[in-house]
Amino acid sequence: MLHLIIADSELELVPKELQNHPSIISHAKRRFKKPEEILLDSTYHHTALKSLKDGERRGRPDIVHLCLINALESILNKEGKLRVYVHTRNNEVIYIKPETRLPRNYNRFVGLMESLFKNRVIPKDLALLRIENKTLSEIIGDIGPDAVFIMHENGVLMSPQSFGRKLNEYISPAVIVGGFPHGDFLSVLEGEKISIYKEPLMAWSVVNEVLINYEGSLLW
């Protein structure tokens, strides 16, 4: 069983210090919602983000969307060999049941995440998605993996195929992929840092390479 954690993800509701910004208010009105009820999104809120010291990396729910679509539609997940978690910059964790079918449409995904932040579980009878306050280290402690690997551009360089074989040496490894556009992890991490390419890759590309090559080693 592989545990995939999208960590320090830039997935959050509009923070209090930005809720009165004109671009936030305008976007919220167009969606018939309050500013505090909408996701922070750099596509619409880039002028507001300029006022934050780390604004260049925030407001990227699209990264989480692409990572989750790729992971949940993977052969590994369909074979019951994958568990996926989303950890956010605000130390929240989203638990996702393997049978969950997320919206392919980005705007519908945004609406789903906004509902999840508000209601904490979706739907209430099935709990396909639920969110809890938890740090990354607490998530790792709950999972109890027999190995932890951190995908990092400064990690030990190995081919995706070699990393897939390495993962297969363990019963329940965890792989941590950053859910942010650039920069480093915000959380303190313990584990082996791995790089699968000579240049930085986007998070969803890393997810694809890890899952496909683990599948190749485990299933075929």
Curated annotation (Swiss-Prot):
Instruction: Fetch the CDD domains from UniProt.
Output: Nep1-like
Q: Where is this site: Interaction with substrate rRNA?
A: R60, R101, R104, R108
List of residues binding S-adenosyl-L-methionine: G178, G183, I196, Y197, K198, E199, P200, L201
The top EC class is transferase
Q: Enumerate the UniProt keywords alphabetically.
A: Methyltransferase, Ribosome biogenesis, RNA-binding, rRNA processing, rRNA-binding, S-adenosyl-L-methionine, Transferase
MF terms from GO for this chain are: rRNA (pseudouridine) methyltransferase activity; rRNA binding
Purpose of the protein = Methyltransferase involved in ribosomal biogenesis. Specifically catalyzes the N1-methylation of the pseudouridine corresponding to position 914 in M.jannaschii 16S rRNA.
Question: Which NCBIfam families does its entry note?
Answer: PRK04171.1-5 (NF003205), PRK04171.2-2 (NF003207)
User: What's the protein here called?
Assistant: Ribosomal RNA small subunit methyltransferase Nep1
Q: Which organism is it from?
A: Thermococcus sibiricus (strain DSM 12597 / MM 739)
Gene that produces this protein: nep1
